[in-house]
From Swiss-Prot:
Name recorded for this polypeptide: Small ribosomal subunit protein uS7
Domain of life, per lineage: Bacteria
Summary of subunit composition and partner proteins: Part of the 30S ribosomal subunit. Contacts proteins S9 and S11.
Gene responsible for this protein: rpsG
UniProt-recorded Gene Ontology molecular function terms: rRNA binding; structural constituent of ribosome; tRNA binding
A single GO BP: translation
Signal peptide: none
Source taxonomy: Bacteria, Pseudomonadati, Pseudomonadota, Betaproteobacteria, Candidatus Tremblaya
Length: 156
Protein backbone atom coordinates (compact mmCIF):
# COMPACT_ATOMS: atom_id res chain seq x y z
CA UNK A 1 0.00 0.00 0.00
CA UNK A 2 1.37 3.42 -0.94
CA UNK A 3 2.33 5.52 2.03
CA UNK A 4 3.06 8.79 0.30
CA UNK A 5 0.33 11.32 -0.22
CA UNK A 6 -0.20 13.06 -3.55
CA UNK A 7 2.15 15.69 -4.88
CA UNK A 8 1.58 19.18 -3.56
CA UNK A 9 0.58 21.64 -6.28
CA UNK A 10 2.85 24.66 -6.32
CA UNK A 11 1.16 28.00 -6.78
CA UNK A 12 2.12 29.55 -10.07
CA UNK A 13 3.94 32.82 -9.81
CA UNK A 14 1.63 35.81 -9.91
CA UNK A 15 3.17 38.98 -11.20
CA UNK A 16 3.20 41.98 -8.84
CA UNK A 17 1.45 44.39 -11.21
CA UNK A 18 -1.57 42.43 -12.47
CA UNK A 19 -1.66 39.74 -9.74
CA UNK A 20 -2.57 37.18 -12.39
CA UNK A 21 -0.82 33.84 -12.92
CA UNK A 22 -1.22 34.05 -16.71
CA UNK A 23 0.74 37.30 -16.91
CA UNK A 24 3.44 35.84 -14.64
CA UNK A 25 3.70 32.78 -16.89
CA UNK A 26 3.97 35.01 -19.96
CA UNK A 27 6.77 37.00 -18.31
CA UNK A 28 8.61 33.77 -17.53
CA UNK A 29 8.18 32.56 -21.12
CA UNK A 30 9.47 35.82 -22.59
CA UNK A 31 12.46 35.80 -20.23
CA UNK A 32 15.82 35.01 -21.87
CA UNK A 33 19.00 34.18 -19.92
CA UNK A 34 17.36 34.91 -16.56
CA UNK A 35 16.65 38.58 -17.32
CA UNK A 36 13.24 38.78 -15.70
CA UNK A 37 13.08 42.57 -15.39
CA UNK A 38 13.65 42.93 -19.14
CA UNK A 39 10.94 40.33 -19.84
CA UNK A 40 8.54 42.03 -17.42
CA UNK A 41 9.16 45.38 -19.11
CA UNK A 42 8.40 43.85 -22.52
CA UNK A 43 5.13 42.26 -21.34
CA UNK A 44 3.96 45.26 -19.28
CA UNK A 45 4.71 47.70 -22.10
CA UNK A 46 2.78 45.55 -24.58
CA UNK A 47 -0.18 45.36 -22.20
CA UNK A 48 -0.03 49.12 -21.55
CA UNK A 49 -0.15 49.69 -25.31
CA UNK A 50 -3.35 47.60 -25.45
CA UNK A 51 -5.12 49.83 -22.95
CA UNK A 52 -3.99 52.33 -20.30
CA UNK A 53 -6.44 50.69 -17.87
CA UNK A 54 -4.82 47.60 -16.32
CA UNK A 55 -8.04 45.66 -15.90
CA UNK A 56 -9.07 46.29 -19.52
CA UNK A 57 -5.66 45.27 -20.88
CA UNK A 58 -5.78 42.06 -18.79
CA UNK A 59 -9.25 41.29 -20.17
CA UNK A 60 -7.99 41.86 -23.72
CA UNK A 61 -5.04 39.51 -23.09
CA UNK A 62 -7.38 36.83 -21.74
CA UNK A 63 -9.68 37.23 -24.75
CA UNK A 64 -6.69 36.85 -27.09
CA UNK A 65 -5.56 33.73 -25.20
CA UNK A 66 -9.10 32.35 -25.42
CA UNK A 67 -8.95 32.77 -29.20
CA UNK A 68 -5.61 30.91 -29.30
CA UNK A 69 -6.47 28.00 -26.96
CA UNK A 70 -6.83 24.67 -28.78
CA UNK A 71 -9.66 22.30 -27.92
CA UNK A 72 -7.99 19.11 -29.20
CA UNK A 73 -4.52 17.94 -30.08
CA UNK A 74 -2.87 15.01 -31.82
CA UNK A 75 -1.28 12.24 -29.76
CA UNK A 76 0.77 9.51 -31.43
CA UNK A 77 -0.48 6.05 -30.49
CA UNK A 78 1.36 2.88 -31.49
CA UNK A 79 -0.83 -0.10 -32.32
CA UNK A 80 0.19 -3.30 -34.08
CA UNK A 81 3.53 -1.99 -35.31
CA UNK A 82 2.00 1.13 -36.85
CA UNK A 83 1.87 4.63 -35.42
CA UNK A 84 -1.45 6.44 -35.57
CA UNK A 85 -2.13 10.08 -34.88
CA UNK A 86 -5.10 10.09 -32.54
CA UNK A 87 -7.01 13.28 -31.66
CA UNK A 88 -7.37 13.83 -27.92
CA UNK A 89 -9.07 16.38 -25.68
CA UNK A 90 -6.82 18.75 -23.72
CA UNK A 91 -7.23 19.76 -20.09
CA UNK A 92 -7.66 23.47 -19.35
CA UNK A 93 -4.19 23.88 -17.82
CA UNK A 94 -2.48 22.51 -20.94
CA UNK A 95 -4.72 24.64 -23.17
CA UNK A 96 -3.52 27.78 -21.40
CA UNK A 97 0.08 26.58 -21.50
CA UNK A 98 -0.06 25.93 -25.25
CA UNK A 99 -1.79 29.26 -25.89
CA UNK A 100 0.89 31.20 -23.98
CA UNK A 101 3.69 29.31 -25.73
CA UNK A 102 2.19 29.84 -29.17
CA UNK A 103 1.57 33.54 -28.47
CA UNK A 104 5.20 34.04 -27.44
CA UNK A 105 6.68 32.09 -30.33
CA UNK A 106 4.44 33.77 -32.92
CA UNK A 107 5.27 37.20 -31.48
CA UNK A 108 9.01 36.58 -31.58
CA UNK A 109 8.80 35.38 -35.22
CA UNK A 110 7.34 38.72 -36.30
CA UNK A 111 9.38 41.31 -38.18
CA UNK A 112 8.91 44.39 -35.96
CA UNK A 113 12.01 45.88 -34.41
CA UNK A 114 11.03 45.90 -30.73
CA UNK A 115 9.84 42.89 -28.74
CA UNK A 116 7.01 44.73 -26.97
CA UNK A 117 5.65 45.91 -30.35
CA UNK A 118 5.81 42.34 -31.67
CA UNK A 119 3.92 41.03 -28.64
CA UNK A 120 1.37 43.86 -28.85
CA UNK A 121 0.70 43.24 -32.55
CA UNK A 122 0.39 39.48 -32.02
CA UNK A 123 -2.16 40.05 -29.22
CA UNK A 124 -4.12 42.40 -31.51
CA UNK A 125 -4.02 39.80 -34.29
CA UNK A 126 -5.20 37.10 -31.87
CA UNK A 127 -8.08 39.36 -30.80
CA UNK A 128 -9.19 39.62 -34.43
CA UNK A 129 -8.56 35.86 -34.97
CA UNK A 130 -5.56 36.36 -37.26
CA UNK A 131 -1.83 35.95 -36.75
CA UNK A 132 0.65 33.15 -36.26
CA UNK A 133 -0.70 31.79 -32.98
CA UNK A 134 -4.26 31.47 -34.28
CA UNK A 135 -2.91 29.90 -37.48
CA UNK A 136 -1.06 27.32 -35.38
CA UNK A 137 -4.22 26.53 -33.40
CA UNK A 138 -6.18 26.13 -36.65
CA UNK A 139 -3.49 23.77 -37.98
CA UNK A 140 -3.76 21.59 -34.85
CA UNK A 141 -7.56 21.56 -35.17
CA UNK A 142 -7.30 20.67 -38.86
CA UNK A 143 -4.99 17.73 -38.05
CA UNK A 144 -7.32 16.54 -35.29
CA UNK A 145 -10.29 16.75 -37.64
CA UNK A 146 -8.45 14.89 -40.40
CA UNK A 147 -7.48 12.06 -38.04
CA UNK A 148 -10.84 11.72 -36.29
CA UNK A 149 -11.21 8.25 -37.86
CA UNK A 150 -8.69 7.00 -35.28
CA UNK A 151 -10.44 8.65 -32.33
CA UNK A 152 -11.97 5.29 -31.31
CA UNK A 153 -8.48 4.06 -30.36
CA UNK A 154 -7.96 6.53 -27.54
CA UNK A 155 -6.64 5.22 -24.26
CA UNK A 156 -8.97 4.86 -21.32
Amino acid sequence: MARKCGAVKLRSCCDPLFEAPEVGRLVNLVMVSGKKTVAARIVYTALAMLSPDRRRSYELLMQALHNIKPSAEIRTRRMGGASYRVPAEICSKRRMSLALRWLKSAAMRRRERYAHVRLYNEILDALSRRGGAVRQRDEVHRLAHANRAFSHSRRG
